[in-house]
């Protein structure tokens, strides 16, 4: 189980990403459309002024049940431990134990 402070930090990052998403896209478009090197550098400077945590790269995929960051299945949004546990209990629709 992840610490609650780590979970809260991830939520804060998610909010920052949503808040600065439009601004970040506009600045990146300016970088692409810049005709001179000076304009490009100015746009890069604007981009670097934004908060670090507003970049989507800094967000980590976490299990919504436990907060675990490693071994998370995208399809379920759960870590491997919870997928196994819930599958055995029959809580995941369409998941069956394989046998051949």
Curated annotation (Swiss-Prot):
Gene3D superfamilies: 1.10.287.1480. It is found in: Plastid, Chloroplast. GO terms for biological process: translation. Belongs to the universal ribosomal protein uS14 family. Keywords: Chloroplast, Plastid, Ribonucleoprotein, Ribosomal protein, RNA-binding, rRNA-binding. Part of the 30S ribosomal subunit. One of its GO terms (molecular function) is structural constituent of ribosome. NCBIfam families: PRK08881.1. It comes from the Eukaryota. This is Small ribosomal subunit protein uS14c. The gene is rps14. The keyword Transmembrane helix does not apply.
